[in-house]
Protein backbone atom coordinates (compact mmCIF):
# COMPACT_ATOMS: atom_id res chain seq x y z
CA UNK A 1 0.00 0.00 0.00
CA UNK A 2 1.42 3.38 -1.00
CA UNK A 3 1.82 6.13 1.58
CA UNK A 4 2.32 9.86 1.31
CA UNK A 5 6.06 9.32 2.01
CA UNK A 6 6.78 7.00 -0.93
CA UNK A 7 7.28 9.87 -3.38
CA UNK A 8 9.63 11.62 -0.96
CA UNK A 9 11.74 8.48 -0.53
CA UNK A 10 11.84 8.01 -4.30
CA UNK A 11 12.90 11.63 -4.79
CA UNK A 12 15.74 11.28 -2.29
CA UNK A 13 16.95 8.03 -3.86
CA UNK A 14 16.76 9.59 -7.32
CA UNK A 15 18.74 12.65 -6.10
CA UNK A 16 21.47 10.44 -4.69
CA UNK A 17 21.61 8.33 -7.84
CA UNK A 18 22.14 11.43 -9.97
CA UNK A 19 24.77 12.94 -7.67
CA UNK A 20 28.05 14.51 -8.68
CA UNK A 21 29.98 13.35 -11.69
CA UNK A 22 32.89 11.09 -10.74
CA UNK A 23 36.31 12.81 -10.83
CA UNK A 24 38.23 13.03 -14.06
CA UNK A 25 41.35 11.09 -13.21
CA UNK A 26 44.37 11.16 -15.46
CA UNK A 27 46.24 7.92 -15.92
CA UNK A 28 49.38 9.47 -17.39
CA UNK A 29 51.78 12.10 -16.15
CA UNK A 30 49.41 15.06 -16.45
CA UNK A 31 47.40 16.83 -13.77
CA UNK A 32 44.53 15.24 -11.82
CA UNK A 33 46.19 11.99 -10.84
CA UNK A 34 44.79 10.38 -7.70
CA UNK A 35 48.28 10.10 -6.22
CA UNK A 36 51.34 12.23 -6.95
CA UNK A 37 54.77 11.64 -5.44
CA UNK A 38 56.49 15.00 -5.05
CA UNK A 39 59.97 13.43 -5.17
CA UNK A 40 59.18 11.89 -8.56
CA UNK A 41 58.01 15.23 -9.95
CA UNK A 42 61.15 16.96 -8.66
CA UNK A 43 63.39 14.30 -10.22
CA UNK A 44 61.57 14.48 -13.56
CA UNK A 45 61.58 18.28 -13.74
CA UNK A 46 65.29 18.78 -13.08
CA UNK A 47 66.97 21.92 -11.77
CA UNK A 48 64.78 24.89 -10.79
CA UNK A 49 63.17 27.23 -11.55
CA UNK A 50 60.08 25.35 -12.73
CA UNK A 51 56.42 24.80 -12.00
CA UNK A 52 54.21 21.78 -12.63
CA UNK A 53 50.41 21.73 -12.52
CA UNK A 54 49.27 18.93 -10.17
CA UNK A 55 45.49 19.51 -10.15
CA UNK A 56 43.46 21.48 -12.69
CA UNK A 57 39.69 21.57 -12.93
CA UNK A 58 36.91 24.14 -13.06
CA UNK A 59 37.22 24.97 -9.34
CA UNK A 60 40.87 24.69 -8.39
CA UNK A 61 44.43 24.85 -9.64
CA UNK A 62 47.25 23.32 -7.62
CA UNK A 63 50.79 23.90 -8.83
CA UNK A 64 54.09 22.58 -7.48
CA UNK A 65 56.70 25.35 -7.75
CA UNK A 66 60.47 25.00 -7.32
CA UNK A 67 62.81 27.97 -6.88
CA UNK A 68 66.59 28.00 -6.55
CA UNK A 69 68.28 30.04 -3.81
CA UNK A 70 67.71 33.74 -4.57
CA UNK A 71 64.97 32.83 -7.06
CA UNK A 72 61.56 34.41 -7.00
CA UNK A 73 58.59 35.62 -8.98
CA UNK A 74 57.36 39.00 -10.23
CA UNK A 75 55.13 41.12 -7.99
CA UNK A 76 51.48 40.51 -8.88
CA UNK A 77 47.96 40.31 -7.48
CA UNK A 78 44.70 38.48 -8.16
CA UNK A 79 41.28 40.09 -8.57
CA UNK A 80 39.08 36.99 -8.41
CA UNK A 81 40.56 34.74 -5.72
CA UNK A 82 42.64 34.40 -2.58
CA UNK A 83 45.80 32.35 -3.00
CA UNK A 84 47.55 30.10 -0.54
CA UNK A 85 50.65 27.92 -0.43
CA UNK A 86 52.04 25.00 1.52
CA UNK A 87 55.82 25.16 1.88
CA UNK A 88 57.27 21.70 1.28
CA UNK A 89 61.00 22.53 1.36
CA UNK A 90 63.30 25.48 1.93
CA UNK A 91 62.65 28.94 3.30
CA UNK A 92 60.55 31.50 1.44
CA UNK A 93 59.64 35.12 1.99
CA UNK A 94 56.43 36.80 0.83
CA UNK A 95 56.47 40.59 0.45
CA UNK A 96 52.90 41.93 0.56
CA UNK A 97 51.02 45.18 0.11
CA UNK A 98 51.01 47.25 3.30
CA UNK A 99 54.66 46.66 4.19
CA UNK A 100 54.00 43.10 5.36
CA UNK A 101 56.70 40.44 5.11
CA UNK A 102 55.97 36.78 5.88
CA UNK A 103 58.75 34.21 6.16
CA UNK A 104 57.77 30.54 5.99
CA UNK A 105 59.55 27.19 6.14
CA UNK A 106 58.68 23.57 5.50
CA UNK A 107 55.25 22.48 6.77
CA UNK A 108 53.94 26.05 7.03
CA UNK A 109 51.01 27.60 5.16
CA UNK A 110 50.76 31.15 3.82
CA UNK A 111 47.48 32.75 2.71
CA UNK A 112 47.20 36.00 0.73
CA UNK A 113 43.79 37.64 0.19
CA UNK A 114 42.71 38.76 -3.28
CA UNK A 115 43.81 42.26 -4.24
CA UNK A 116 47.08 42.02 -2.29
CA UNK A 117 50.24 42.64 -4.31
CA UNK A 118 52.69 39.89 -3.44
CA UNK A 119 55.87 38.27 -4.60
CA UNK A 120 57.76 35.33 -3.26
CA UNK A 121 61.48 34.73 -3.05
CA UNK A 122 63.64 31.88 -1.86
CA UNK A 123 65.73 33.28 1.01
CA UNK A 124 67.27 29.94 1.96
CA UNK A 125 70.43 28.21 0.78
CA UNK A 126 68.65 25.27 -0.84
CA UNK A 127 65.88 24.48 -3.30
CA UNK A 128 62.46 25.66 -2.18
CA UNK A 129 59.26 23.80 -3.01
CA UNK A 130 55.74 25.06 -2.50
CA UNK A 131 52.25 24.00 -3.51
CA UNK A 132 50.25 26.97 -4.78
CA UNK A 133 46.47 26.69 -4.55
CA UNK A 134 44.39 29.02 -6.71
CA UNK A 135 41.09 29.28 -8.55
CA UNK A 136 40.88 29.12 -12.35
CA UNK A 137 41.66 30.87 -14.55
CA UNK A 138 44.20 32.27 -12.03
CA UNK A 139 44.72 35.60 -13.76
CA UNK A 140 47.85 37.45 -12.61
CA UNK A 141 47.94 41.26 -12.68
CA UNK A 142 51.55 42.43 -12.51
CA UNK A 143 52.34 45.43 -10.36
CA UNK A 144 55.20 47.21 -8.62
CA UNK A 145 56.19 46.12 -5.10
CA UNK A 146 55.97 48.78 -2.35
CA UNK A 147 58.65 47.20 -0.18
CA UNK A 148 61.42 46.43 -2.68
CA UNK A 149 60.57 48.99 -5.38
CA UNK A 150 60.64 46.26 -8.05
CA UNK A 151 58.98 47.49 -11.25
CA UNK A 152 60.77 45.63 -14.06
CA UNK A 153 58.79 42.94 -15.88
CA UNK A 154 61.77 40.63 -16.37
CA UNK A 155 63.23 37.86 -14.23
CA UNK A 156 65.33 38.90 -11.28
CA UNK A 157 67.75 37.35 -8.82
CA UNK A 158 66.53 38.43 -5.41
CA UNK A 159 69.78 38.06 -3.43
CA UNK A 160 71.72 41.19 -4.28
Residue spans for each PLM region:
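Short acidic-glycine-tyrosine-enriched beta hairpin
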Residues: 98-114
